[in-house]
Amino acid sequence: MSKLKNKKRHLEENEEEQLPIFDKDSGEDGHLDDGDEDPADLSDSEESVFSGLEDSGSDDEDDDEDDDEDDDDKDGSEEKSSDAEEDKADDDDGDLKLSAKDDVKPQVDSQNSKEKKKKKRKGKSVLKDGGEEDVASGRDEALKITSQVDEYDHDTSDEEDIRNTVGNIPMEWYKDYPHIGYDLDGKKIFKPIRNKDELDEFLDKMENPDYWRTVQDKMTGADIRLSDEQVDLVHRLQQGKFGDVNFNEYEPAVDFFSNEVMIHPVTNRPQDKRSFIPSLIEKEKVGKLVHAIKMGWIKPRRPKETTPQYYDLWAKEDPNSILGRHKMHVPAPKMKLPGHEESYNPPPEYLLSEEERLAWAAQDPEDRKLSFLPQKFSCLRAVPAFSRFIHERFERCLDLYLCPRQRKMRVNVNPEDLIPKLPKPKDLQPFPTTQSLVYRGHSSLVRSISVSPSGQWLVSGSDDCTVRFWEVSTARCLKTVQVGGAVKGVAWNPNPSICLVAVSYEDSVLLLNPALGDRLLCTATDQLISSYAEPEEVKEQPVQWLVSEGEGHEQGHRLVLKHPKAVRQVTWHAKGDYLACVLPDSSSSVQVLIHQVSKRRTQNPFRKSKGLVQCVSFHPVRPYFFVATQRYVRVYNLIKQELTKKLMANCKWISSMAIHPGGDNVICGSYDCRLAWFDLDLSTKPYKVLRHHKKALRSVSFHSHYPLLASGSDDGSVIVCHGMVYNDLLQNPLIVPVKVLKGHSITHDLGVLDVTFHPTQPWVFSSGADATIRLYT
C-alpha cells in the first residue's frame, strides 16, 4: 500500500511541477501514450539524462525509501531497494507522459514498465562498472539540455529595448539638435529624416492601412506600429475598462461570516488548560512590584495641584522695569544729523542761485527738500541767532506725541531682483538705431507726416501753409502744394489702389491727387472721383462737398470739404473709402464727422459728445471706432451703434492714440509724460504705463508688420520700444524699450510733433518744431 501511495503522490507532484526539459521534448514529440511508447525509442542521450537525474537524487525518493524501510523488515532490504529503483523508473516514465499534455492523463502499461525497469537497471549497472567517465558525460549532456532553456524568457521590463540612454528627461531639449540622444556606446542617435510635406502625409494616410496604428517613439524618433494587443489595450483604457482582459471585477463575494446566526461555531477547538490556571509570569511581575514598593523604590504619584480658573495677568511682572510698564514701547526716532548745507561756511555748490531761490520760494513747504536757505558767513562770530528755534522745537514735540510709531521689519532684498528680467535689445533686432536722412524745406513747424502704402513717398504738412511731397530714399522734395492755412494734419490713403491724400487746414479738408508713381493708378483715381453721380434727392449735410477746378485742379486738388469749425485731425479707414475728422469744440455736439468719399456723404455718428474729443481712429479689422477724450477712450460698435468699452487712461490729458495691427491692443500718449498700453482682452485699465519721456508726448505709432512702437515728445527724443503681442491669450504682451533716438532741436518749448513708421521697413520718420523731418533706420 505504501508503494502505491508513493507512486500516486509522485504522479500528482509531477503534474504540478514539470521540468522544462520534458516540456521541450513533449512539444517536439507530440502526444505521448502508453500504447505508442517503446523503450527502444529512447536515445542514449535521453537515457544518460534520466540516469543523471536519478543519480542526483531528490527528497521525494528519500521519503519513499524511508516509507519502504518502515513498512518492511530488515531482512528484505535488498528487495526493497530494487523496488525503490523500480519506483524511480516508473516516476520518470510518468514525467514523460505528463509533459505531453496537461489535460490527457496517461495510463500505465505494466509490460512497458517492466522493460523500462530492466533497461534502467542495466544502465545503472553499466554506470557502476564503467567508472566515472560515463556518468560525467551523461551529466554534461543534461546540463546542455537544461542550459537551452532561458529562465529570463518570461521576464519583462519597460526599459529593455530602449537604446537611448539620456534617461527620463523632456525630449524637447533635443528639438534644436540633429540627434535625439546617445546609445550604449556613447554615440549620437540621429533623428530619422522627415521630409514629408502635407501632401505626403495625406497620401500616407489614405494608402497606408497601418497609418492609424502608427505612433512615433519620442526616445528614438522612429515610427512604431502598434500590435493588435496594444491597440486592444488602448481601446480598453479609453473605455474605462481594466487592461487585463481576463480580469473579472465582478467576482462573486463569499461572505464567510454572514449575518445568519449559525448553530455550530466556526472552529470547535477546545480551550487550553492554561486558560483555567493563573499565570505564573504575572505572579512574578506582581511580586517584583510589591517588593519594590516595600523597599521604597516605587513611590505613589503626587496629586496634581489645582490651579485657579482666573489668574492675574500682571502677577509676575516687575513693576520697576520699563518694558513691564510699556509693552509696546517704541523709542522716538533720532533727529537727522546736520549736513554741509547747515554749515556757517558751506561749500559753494550748496549755496542756491537766484533762480533756485525763487523756485524754492514758489514751492509748498511740504515739497521743499530743505526747510531753510543755506547761508554763508565769514566767521562763527557773525552767525546770528536761529530765529526759528522755538518753532522747530515745537514741531519736534508735536511729532513725538502726535505721530504714531510702528515697528517695521527690514527685509534685505537685492535691488537687482526687483528689476524685471527683460531680453537684451540686440536679441530684438531689427529696429531703427541711427539717423539716416534729414528732409529740409519747410520754414515752420511740421505738424503732421504720412507715408504712402508703397513706402516710396512721404507727405508732410506745416504751419507755413504748404504740403510737401518727398521721395523717401533721396530726401528730395518732388512737389509743393499751397493751401489756405496752417496744415494741422495729413493722411495718405492706405488703399494701394487709390492715390489720394487728405489734408486738413482751418475749417477745410482737401483731397489731393499727388500724381506720383504709376500714372495708371493716378488716372484711375481721377476717374473714380469724377464718376460720381448726384442722387435725385439731395439730403442736407453738415459739410459742403466742393469739386476743385482751374488752377487748383492742376495742382492736384480734387475735392474740398467745408466744415462748420476748424478741423484738427484726419484719419482713413483701412479700406480707404471712409474718412474721419475731428472738430474739437466742447460747446458743440458736432465733434466727429465720418465722410464716405465714393458716395460723398457725411454723417455725425454721435448725437452728443461726452467731453472734448482729442483724436479718433478706426479698428484695422473689425467695425469698431475709437474716440479719445481728455481722460477716457471709448470704443463704439458701428454696426450695433452702441458703446462696447470705456478705457480709463489714468492720465490728465490724452494727446494721441494708435491701434495695434491686430486690433486687441491700444496705446495712448498724454501731456503728463505717460504712455499707457491697453490690452482690450485683459482689462479696461492700462496693462502698463511707461514714463520714459521727461516732457509731454505728442504722437505715438505702431508698425504695421514689425513688433515696434514709437513715441515722440517735447524733449526732442523718439523712444522706440519692442512690443510683442502673442497669439496665446494666456501670455501677456512684452514691452521692452530698445532705443532712444535724438536729433530734433527744441524750438519754442516744442520738440517732436509727429512720428510714423515705414510700411514695410523697420524705419521711423519724425517731424519736429525745428522745421525738419528725420528718417531713422
From Swiss-Prot:
GO cellular component terms, A-Z: nucleoplasm; PeBoW complex; preribosome, large subunit precursor
SMART domains attached to this UniProt entry: BOP1NT (SM01035), WD40 (SM00320)
Database matches in Gene3D superfamilies: YVTN repeat-like/Quinoprotein amine dehydrogenase
Compositional bias (Basic and acidic residues): 22-33, 95-106, 126-140
UniProt subunit comment: Component of the PeBoW complex, composed of bop1, pes1 and wdr12. The complex is held together by bop1, which interacts with pes1 via its N-terminal domain and with wdr12 via a high-affinity interaction between the seven-bladed beta-propeller domains of the 2 proteins. The PeBoW complex associates with the 66S pre-ribosome.
Cellular localization per UniProt: Nucleus, Nucleolus; Nucleus, Nucleoplasm
Purpose of the protein: Component of the PeBoW complex, which is required for maturation of 28S and 5.8S ribosomal RNAs and formation of the 60S ribosome.
Pfam families tied to this protein: BOP1NT, WD40
Gene that encodes it: bop1
WD repeat locations: 441-480, 482-522, 562-605, 608-646, 649-688, 692-731, 747-777
One annotated GO molecular function: ribonucleoprotein complex binding
Family named by the database record: Belongs to the WD repeat BOP1/ERB1 family.
The protein's name in its UniProt record: Ribosome biogenesis protein bop1
CDD domains: WD40
Region entry Disordered, spans: 1-140
Family annotation (PANTHER family): RIBOSOME BIOGENESIS PROTEIN BOP1, RIBOSOME BIOGENESIS PROTEIN BOP1 BLOCK OF PROLIFERATION 1 PROTEIN
Keyword vocabulary terms for this entry: Nucleus, Repeat, Ribosome biogenesis, rRNA processing, WD repeat
One GO term (biological process): maturation of LSU-rRNA from tricistronic rRNA transcript (SSU-rRNA, 5.8S rRNA, LSU-rRNA)
Compositionally biased region (Acidic residues): 34-47, 56-76, 84-94
Biased composition (Basic residues): 115-125
